[in-house]
Amino acid sequence: MAKQVVKKIKLQILAGKANPAPPVGPALGQAQVNIPSFCSQFNEATKDQANYLVTAVISVYNDRSFTFIIKTPPASSLLKKAANIKLGSANSNKNKVATIKFDQIKEIATLKMPDLNAYTLESACKIIEGTARNMGIIVEK
């Protein structure tokens, strides 16, 4: 008999810095997952992506075991890092907070390609450009 997935948990955690404190501890504790085991496995798997916010999708099975998939960092956090800003604009139509080059958009789109709903790099760039526009970041061609 195959293991059944009882719960799916989606968390955004700094790569290499998972610990039992919130938000990790309470989310996994409710699903009765071995928290120290998850933290050590997650930190080992993400040690090369230091200081990036990554999304972990955790599947919890009926025997309390788990597996997890690590997705690429959110586009907004990659754009903030590329533009050297802490936050995007609250009113992106009027207030522009930064300017980045199209080459940086292309680099981010290449990194995000596996997680985006796009088949070509050109369409992935358009998705990332739209995110940048909504954050108040100007893209120079």
From Swiss-Prot:
InterPro entries registered for this protein in UniProt: Ribosomal_uL11, Ribosomal_uL11_bac-typ, Ribosomal_uL11_C, Ribosomal_uL11_C_sf, Ribosomal_uL11_CS, Ribosomal_uL11_N, Ribosomal_uL11_N_sf
Biological process according to GO: translation
Protein name: Large ribosomal subunit protein uL11
Similarity comment text for this entry: Belongs to the universal ribosomal protein uL11 family.
Source organism per UniProt: Phytoplasma mali (strain AT)
GO cellular component term of the entry, any: cytosolic large ribosomal subunit
PTM: One or more lysine residues are methylated.
Molecular-function GO terms, alphabetical: large ribosomal subunit rRNA binding; structural constituent of ribosome
Annotated gene: rplK
PROSITE patterns xref list: RIBOSOMAL_L11 (PS00359)
UniProt entry tagged with the keyword RNA-binding: yes
Subunit text: Part of the ribosomal stalk of the 50S ribosomal subunit. Interacts with L10 and the large rRNA to form the base of the stalk. L10 forms an elongated spine to which L12 dimers bind in a sequential fashion forming a multimeric L10(L12)X complex.
Pfam family, one: Ribosomal_L11_N
